[in-house]
């Protein structure tokens, strides 16, 4: 029963850790002085093909797209992998 619960919770945990890791790597989460700082805008040096009309404070890093990719994309891959694995279990390649 513990294994089944872990299999269900694993995609959520991986998505959460992945989101925290990448936002820390990009400099959005600042882990200084034991306080969680949040700086959503980064001024990328090579961020645009056309350098004119860039925002003054940089571009937002954490957007709805970031949330969708990290929080929805990773569990979707696990879900599709589970459906793929079920095809083999159903045909008797693996004994369930």
Swiss-Prot record:
Is Transmembrane helix one of the keywords UniProt gives this record?
Answer: yes
Q: Which Gene Ontology cellular-component terms appear in the entry?
A: photosystem II reaction center
Provide this UniProt record's keywords sorted from A to Z.
Answer: Membrane, Transmembrane, Transmembrane helix
Q: Name the source's superkingdom.
A: Bacteria
Q: A single GO BP annotation from the record?
A: photosynthetic electron transport chain
Gene Ontology molecular-function annotations: heme binding
- Keyword Membrane present in the record's keywords: the answer is yes
Q: How does it sit in the membrane?
A: Multi-pass membrane protein
Location of this chain's protein in the cell: Membrane
Q: Where are the transmembrane segments?
A: 6-26, 66-86
**Main location per UniProt?**
membrane
Sorted alphabetically, which SUPFAM superfamilies does this protein's record hold? Cytochrome b559 subunits (SSF161045)
Q: Which NCBIfam families match?
A: cyt_b559_beta (TIGR01333), PRK02561.1-1 (NF002717)
**What protein family is recorded?**
Belongs to the PsbE/PsbF family.
Q: What the protein does?
A: Unknown. Resembles PsbF, one of the subunits of the photosystem II reaction center. However, it encodes asparagine rather than histidine at the site PsbF uses to bind heme.
Query: What protein does this entry describe?
Result: PsbF-like protein
Q: Which organism is it from?
A: Prochlorococcus marinus (strain SARG / CCMP1375 / SS120)
């Amino acid at each position: 029963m513990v294994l089944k619960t872990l299999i269900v919770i694993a995609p959520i945990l991986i998505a959460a850790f992945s989101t925290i890791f990448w936002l820390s790597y990009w400099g959005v989460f600042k882990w200084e002085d034991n306080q969680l700082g949040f700086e959503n805008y980064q001024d990328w040096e090579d961020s645009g093909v056309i350098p004119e009309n860039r925002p003054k404070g940089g571009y937002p890093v954490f957007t709805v797209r970031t949330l969708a990719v990290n929080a929805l994309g990773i569990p979707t891959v696990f879900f599709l992998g589970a459906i793929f694995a079920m095809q083999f279990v159903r045909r008797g390649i693996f004994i369930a």
